[in-house]
Regions:
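Short glycine/serine/threonine-biased micro-segments
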Residues: 61, 127, 189
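Asp-based, Mg2+/Mn2+-dependent phosphohydrolase catalytic module
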Residues: 1-11, 114, 130-240
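Short glycine/serine/threonine/alanine-rich loop segments
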Residues: 39, 121, 206
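Helix C-cap/helix->beta junction micro-motif
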Residues: 82, 119-120, 204
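Substrate-recognition element of Asp-dependent hydrolases with the DxDx(T/V) motif
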Residues: 90-92, 98-104, 109-141, 149-153
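N-terminal helical cap/lid subdomain that shapes the substrate entry/recognition surface
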Residues: 4-107
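Generic recognition of short, well-ordered alpha-helical segments
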Residues: 24-28, 107-111, 136, 163-164
Length: 240
């Protein structure tokens, strides 16, 4: 661990696609659900679902859909595309249960977070994921015992990247919804989603760190404070 003075001391972590490998968990859970109804999953089916799922979450971020519309709508579209006859709500329930159990740690993130905790960093989870799934992940991986707090959009009543989401976070962290710039300068958000995490950081007036997954590009030329391709690169930023 570096020994220079810290530039930031409050970290806001995204879970899915950042601390944990969401695509792998998504593929495993979807495959399990399909096999339960006697359908052998193929790679193109999994990739189709992933694209459909992402499009629905982006519409949630823009305020075009509600969370229930996202959760059911993505499967209604996916199952309809492949003419799969099954109960959509039951399929969703089994899928969500799988997501909570299939936990794949990314870049040794738990050890990283534990190390940062031991060096005095305050760490918080900021996620749009469903409450039951995220709480299960936090419990089963032990991440919930490491971080200082958890902000789940369903519990807050508003999703990332909305400014109001972060105002609620700030109220718990700083005791006020609109902290001054000196306070905001202590905070760094780290996440893989440009539209949710990075835009959220911009809306909140805090610095951002984009965890760029392979093959992804900043096609919208969104202003980003930092960019990393491995989570442990965050140490160079925190102690620069």
């Amino acid at each position: 661990m570096h020994t220079k003075s810290k530039r930031y001391d409050i970290l806001l972590w995204d879970i899915d696609g950042t601390l944990m490998d969401f695509k792998k968990a998504e593929a495993m859970s979807l495959s399990q659900c399909l096999r339960e109804i006697h359908i052998e999953p193929e790679q193109d089916m999994i990739e189709d679902y992933s694209r459909i799922n992402l499009s629905y979450w982006k519409r949630l971020e823009k305020g075009e859909l509600t969370k229930p519309e996202v959760l059911l709508g993505r499967f209604t579209e996916f199952l309809g595309k492949y003419d799969i006859k099954t109960d959509v709500k039951e399929f969703l329930q089994h899928y969500e249960e799988g997501l909570g159990h299939f936990n794949f740690i990314q870049d040794d993130s738990l050890k990283l977070c534990q190390c940062l905790k031991e060096h005095g960093f305050r760490q918080y989870i900021v996620t749009n994921g469903t409450v039951d799934v995220q709480r299960m992940k936090l419990r089963e991986t032990g991440l919930g015992r490491i971080v200082d707090g958890v902000f789940i959009s369903d519990e807050l009543g508003i999703p990332k990247p909305q400014k109001a989401f972060f105002e609620i976070c700030f109220e718990e962290i700083f005791g006020e919804k609109e902290p001054d710039q000196n306070q905001r300068s202590r905070v760094l958000i780290i996440g893989d989603s440009l539209s949710s995490d990075i835009q959220g950081g911009i809306n909140a007036g805090i610095d951002t760190c984009w965890y760029r997954n392979p093959g992804e590009d900043n096609t919208e030329s969104m202003p980003i404070t930092y960019e990393i391709t491995h989570l442990h690169q965050i140490l160079d930023i925190l102690y620069s």
